[in-house]
Amino acid sequence: MQIYQPHPWPLTVEEAITIQEELRHQVITQDQFTQPVQYVAGVDMGFEADGTISRAAVAVLSFPDLQVVETSLAYRPTSFPYIPGFLSFREIPAVLDALEKIQTKPDIILCDGQGIAHPRRLGIASHLGVLLNIPTIGVAKSLLIGRHEELADTKGSWQPLIHRGEIIGAVLRTRVGVKPVYVSSGHKISLPTAIDYVLRCTPKYRLPETTRVADKLASNR
């Protein structure tokens, strides 16, 4: 997969904020992709040597049957510290290396993290989507910002995630009796469509199959 040269990677939080403020205006939260979708991908991260080495995994699955088509791993020195709200600067450099190795271009990428459900509306899914010009969805295991009403226990139940009067995502139940996930538009996809694809990628478990496969690779399991 061809990767174009991204912006320079920052060394300070101040530089990172400047990049986020610039890129947030390029995020598209309407559906802009070709259907039917044939391939979906997941990306996940692991770290080695006390966090000094980043290990990025990409898993491409066929859709809608969710069979593994291609995987890749990439390693590179970690160049940015762990700071909530800035994880994309720590993780995306290695993710781009892993994506460059794959031959099958995904139609949608599901990221283990936030899309626009982020203080500056540029979580890792949105950041990656803008850099690649590919539709992306944020599927996070925990809440970063926002509030929501109580959620019903049935699969497919969801409530809007609201921050400063704006709907920035949804809390979504993907499995009965299990903690929900936090879904948000990353890039070139609307929230209702993002919810639909997350549900179609979670036939058995809480997390999308894309994330589960990528996580096993990234965790060396």
From Swiss-Prot:
Pfam families: Endonuclease_5 (PF04493). It is found in: Cytoplasm. Its EC number is 3.1.21.7. The lineage of its organism: Bacteria, Bacillati, Cyanobacteriota, Cyanophyceae, Nostocales. It catalyses: Endonucleolytic cleavage at apurinic or apyrimidinic sites to products with a 5'-phosphate. Signal peptide: none annotated. Gene3D superfamilies: archaeoglobus fulgidus dsm 4304 superfamily (3.30.2170.10). It is an enzyme of class 3 (hydrolase). Mg(2+) binds at D44, D112. NCBIfam families: PRK11617.1. It comes from the Bacteria. The record marks Y82 as: Interaction with target DNA. Its cofactor is Mg(2+). One of its GO terms (molecular function) is deoxyribonuclease V activity. Belongs to the endonuclease V family. DNA repair enzyme involved in the repair of deaminated bases. Selectively cleaves double-stranded DNA at the second phosphodiester bond 3' to a deoxyinosine leaving behind the intact lesion on the nicked DNA. The keyword Lyase does not apply. GO terms for cellular component: cytoplasm. This is Endonuclease V. Disulfide bonds: none annotated. Coiled coil: none annotated. GO terms for biological process: DNA repair.
